[in-house]
């Protein structure tokens, strides 16, 4: 049985609080901290002012492959791997730091829309660790993009270099353009 310390518990509460602020689901908190479900529920209500959402987690590797999610997932994964390799952080600390940097990048763009939630980012990291997904280099721009591990990747071209026909035709973009027209 592990001996609990006040400092250790404070660190677990800090991790849980950071994840809650970023929008993590309760199941993520349970996996990444040693706090009890009851403590996490109480902390969640204290931080967010509401109970955590219920239901199944978004578990699918296919979501990360579609056009816009792939761009955002690839950006996040590039940041995450950079943090692991160069910043001396790992585990949940790398997830939190990389996700905050991802938010800074996306929200720094006019009309930038956050597509990747912290929960999906957490799953993406798990999929990479399980060998289900990988980064592959685009032959046109040399950027690295998220793909399934067992797919053929000869002459891979990313969704930025070769966007789908309806790419960028979102309601958010239409609202943004309407705002500039006024």
Swiss-Prot record:
Subcellular localization(s) per the UniProt record: Cytoplasm
Gene Ontology cellular component annotations, sorted alphabetically: cytoplasm
Gene Ontology BP terms: bacterial-type flagellum organization; positive regulation of DNA-templated transcription; regulation of bacterial-type flagellum assembly
Cofactor(s) needed for function: Zn(2+)
Swiss-Prot/TrEMBL keywords: Activator, Bacterial flagellum biogenesis, Cytoplasm, DNA-binding, Metal-binding, Transcription, Transcription regulation, Zinc
Keyword DNA-binding: yes
Cofactor note: Binds 1 zinc ion per subunit.
Major localization class: cytoplasm
SUPFAM superfamilies per the UniProt record, alphabetical: FlhC-like
Binding residues for Zn(2+): 138, 141, 158, 161
Single GO MF descriptor: DNA binding
Coiled-coil regions, chain positions: none
InterPro entries (UniProt xref): FlhC
Domain of life assignment: Bacteria
Keyword flag Iron-sulfur: no
Oligomeric form and interacting partners: Heterohexamer composed of two FlhC and four FlhD subunits. Each FlhC binds a FlhD dimer, forming a heterotrimer, and a hexamer assembles by dimerization of two heterotrimers.
Similarity annotation: Belongs to the FlhC family.
Function per UniProt: Functions in complex with FlhD as a master transcriptional regulator that regulates transcription of several flagellar and non-flagellar operons by binding to their promoter region. Activates expression of class 2 flagellar genes, including fliA, which is a flagellum-specific sigma factor that turns on the class 3 genes. Also regulates genes whose products function in a variety of physiological pathways.
Protein name stated in the entry: Flagellar transcriptional regulator FlhC
Natural source organism: Gallionella capsiferriformans (strain ES-2) (Gallionella ferruginea capsiferriformans (strain ES-2))
Gene responsible for this protein: flhC
